């Protein structure tokens, strides 16, 4: 045949791997702009690329390490876990999905509460984990935020929520949607007590989170370039049949329109939060 020269004459050719070197996973990170960053350098810079300023998506472990002095904090309500109240099943049973994501992430749900000091200022921080079913809002998130607010009221402490979520958890249906009202009611109590509430919006913050407590904080901060909105840009574009403005739904766009108070780099968030607490609490 004309293309016989493409064929191997000898089958099952093997290549020796004796001299090959394994590269540990996570040793290097590539940003969307193509910049290659060594993992240790990235970690030392709070997971922000020093080359282009890109903020790599991180979870509660990293955020607590960045914010709390010497990474010392006490986790609150760690034993609260999701249950399959509806026997829900989509492509797989919800109970099986929970087991898989818990094993993969070593988390119990999509949010963690902790109390500690940020540059000496004691406060409570709730941080969402996007790696746990997209940081979705379920009954556990609502309950943990309720308990965090009660702790703040009992101990007269400021409160911060780090938001990164795709919205409500569909597997919990109405139970999930009920959490919006539940959380807002508790945050109203926090406000009535004269206690500070700070929200830090990270990429992405969407759905019911944006439609409720992400946008009702006393001070709203956001990471540079974070996507923030209710529905995604593709859904909006297909619904209205028009192209969207450039930079639509970015934190910078929202600050320009008055929805975000400050754009704060992750490398500066600890200092910004502690200064805000000093200014507004003392």
Swiss-Prot record:
The keyword Cytoplasm is annotated on this UniProt entry: yes
Annotated keywords: ATP-binding, Cytoplasm, Fatty acid biosynthesis, Fatty acid metabolism, Lipid biosynthesis, Lipid metabolism, Nucleotide-binding, Transferase
Gene Ontology MF terms: acetyl-CoA carboxylase activity; ATP binding; carboxyl- or carbamoyltransferase activity
Database matches in SUPFAM superfamilies: ClpP/crotonase (SSF52096)
Ranges for domain CoA carboxyltransferase N-terminal: 26-282
Catalytic activity: N(6)-carboxybiotinyl-L-lysyl-[protein] + acetyl-CoA = N(6)-biotinyl-L-lysyl-[protein] + malonyl-CoA
Location of this chain's protein in the cell: Cytoplasm
Keyword Cytoplasm tagged: yes
One GO CC term, this protein: acetyl-CoA carboxylase complex
EC number(s) on file: 2.1.3.15
Entry similarity comment: Belongs to the AccD/PCCB family.
Role this protein plays: Component of the acetyl coenzyme A carboxylase (ACC) complex. Biotin carboxylase (BC) catalyzes the carboxylation of biotin on its carrier protein (BCCP) and then the CO(2) group is transferred by the transcarboxylase to acetyl-CoA to form malonyl-CoA.
Record protein name field: Acetyl-coenzyme A carboxylase carboxyl transferase subunit beta
Name of the coding gene: accD
